[in-house]
C-alpha cells in the first residue's frame, strides 16, 4: 500500500513552524506496514490544495491530510476534500456535543458561528474523535482510495492517530509486526557485512539496520495475520542472525544485549541489579557523573544505588577515594591501576556489591601521552578487581564520554549475567 502525507498550512511553508507531524505519521505508518512514498506541504489555498489532492489520488492508495481543520476561513481542508470527492459536509453529533460542553463553561458570546465548522465531517466518513481539541477528524474511502483528515496541532494529532486512526487502519489492512534487536560492540558496517546475504535477499521478514551513537539496532518486520505467527517467523530469523559471527570470529549472540525500540544498556543493567538484589556505586573521572546520573534516571534507582564519587583531578582521587597520591603519579590517572583502585575504593567506602570506575582522555588533546578517546574502566566485586581499556577514536568529547558510559554499563551487565549462570 502506498501512502501520501499532505501537510496543510502556510506557516509550514514560511518556516514559522516545523512539520514534526510528518515524522510521527511516517513512523506510525511504517509500524503498520504502510509505505509512505510522498510528503507534500501546501499553503492555505483551495486551488493549490485541490491540485495536490488530485495528484495524490492518482499515485497513492492512502492520502493523509493534516492541518486546516480549525474554525477560521483559511482552515479549508475538509471543505476542499469534500469538494474534490463531490460530497457534502455534515455535522457529527458527538463533536457538536463536545462544542456545547466546551462553550457551556464560557461566556455565551465567545461561541461564534465559525466554531461550528470544527464539528463538520465529510458525508459518509468515519468520524475520528478529538480527545484533546475540538476539531473532529475523519476517514473515508472513495473509488478504492482512502482519505484521512487530521488536526494540525501535534498534541491533537498524536492523540487522534494513536487512539483512533491506528486501530482503524489495523482492522483495514494487514498488520506489520516488528522486533528490534540491539547490539553493542559491533559497528553497523560490519554487521551489514556479515548479514549481507540476509539483507540483500530479504522479502518477508525484512531486516533494517540502524546505527545510533555507540550501538546498532536491527528491526525485523513481517506482515502476517496475528502475533503468534509473527513471533514464529521473527524468532526463526533471529536465531539465524545470532548464529553468525563477526569478522573477528565473535558470535553475534555475544554482542547482542536486548530487545526493544526504547531499551538501553543502562536499562538492561539496572533491571539485572534489581533482579539479583545487588547494589552498585561508581567513581567517575572523565564522565563526570554521567554513569551515575543515567542510572539514577530509572524509577526505583535507590534500590540499587545509594551514591558515588566524581573525582576529576589526581588530587581529588587521592583525597576522596583514599588512593596513594604517589602511586597515582607513578601510574598516571589514565591507567589500569587507577581504574581498578577507584572501583575498589568506591565499593569499600560505600559497602556496595559492585564498584565501577571510569578514567581516561575525553579529548580533544592528549593526556599523559595517551590519545584522546583512551578510556580505562574498572570493576570491583567482593571476589575480583579487573579493568578494561577501550579506545574511542575519531569522536567528539561528548561522544567519548557517552560511549565510555555504555562500555561501563556493558561491563557490569556481563558480570551480572555471569552471576545468573552460577545460580
Curated annotation (Swiss-Prot):
Superkingdom of this entry's organism?
Bacteria
Recorded hits in Pfam families, A to Z, give: CinA, CinA_KH, MoCF_biosynth
Looking up CDD domains in the UniProt record yields: cinA
Which SMART domains does the record match to this protein? MoCF_biosynth
Question: Which NCBIfam families does the UniProt record give?
Answer: cinA_nterm, molyb_syn, PncC_domain, PRK00549.1
- Family per record: Belongs to the CinA family.
Q: What is this protein called?
A: Putative competence-damage inducible protein
Q: Can you name the source organism? A: Streptococcus pyogenes serotype M12 (strain MGAS2096)
